[in-house]
Amino acid sequence: MSRIGKRPISIPGGVDVNIEGNVVTVKGPKGTLTKEMHSLINIAVEEQQIVVTRPDDQPLSRSLHGLTRTLVANMVEGVTKGFSKSLDMVGVGYRAAKQGNKLVLSVGKSHPVELIPFEGIEVEVPAQNKIIVKGMDKELVGDFAAEIRKERPPEPYKGKGIKYENEVVRRKAGKTGAKKGGKK
């Protein structure tokens, strides 16, 4: 039995869970999330808990069991608390600004990069070099944060670029000076 999959998910107050076939709909204070799960896994609501079960011990069923439970748990957490991901910009002249609903990045390119957040995603810029991506869908929050990071990933020599707040950038030593004259 999957250690993660067999744990029931408790439904907090103010959250409504509706399961039709393999489509799970979760309504809460922050909004509504709907996701279609794999038809092999059974999802049921039993006395203020969501229980995820699998029909057999086939490798596919076993791998989907924990995944489905985690996806449903993330939906419940998303409509109650929401998710956020912070990014830091390291480098001279690297800055972010919000113009309307667009995020404008100055990351050393010949032009400012404009990114439009996905639907249901909110972007905050508390400082010029800090970006916070918020939303109730964990997958979309992570995808948009990755989209921002992709514009200028951190480089290993000076660490310049856009990195996640808790990301550790592996640093490399630079070139050592060559002797005068060199090889002949």
From Swiss-Prot:
Which domain of life, per UniProt?
Bacteria
UniProt keyword Transport, yes or no: no
Key words of the record: Ribonucleoprotein, Ribosomal protein, RNA-binding, rRNA-binding
How far does the signal peptide extend, from start to end residue? none
Q: Output the GO biological process annotations, alphabetical, semicolon-separated.
A: cytoplasmic translation
> One MF term in GO for this entry?
rRNA binding
Short name of one Pfam family:
Ribosomal_L6
InterPro entries per record: Ribosomal_uL6-like (IPR000702), Ribosomal_uL6-like_a/b-dom_sf (IPR036789), Ribosomal_uL6_a/b-dom (IPR020040), Ribosomal_uL6_bac-type (IPR019906), Ribosomal_uL6_CS (IPR002358)
Instruction: List the GO cellular component terms.
Output: cytosolic large ribosomal subunit
Concerning its family, UniProt says:
Belongs to the universal ribosomal protein uL6 family.
PANTHER family given in the database record: 60S/50S RIBOSOMAL PROTEIN L6/L9, LARGE RIBOSOMAL SUBUNIT PROTEIN UL6M
Q: How does it assemble?
A: Part of the 50S ribosomal subunit.
Q: What does this protein do?
A: This protein binds to the 23S rRNA, and is important in its secondary structure. It is located near the subunit interface in the base of the L7/L12 stalk, and near the tRNA binding site of the peptidyltransferase center.
Can you say what this protein is called?
Large ribosomal subunit protein uL6
The protein's organism comes out as Desulfitobacterium hafniense (strain Y51)
Name of the gene this protein is made from: rplF
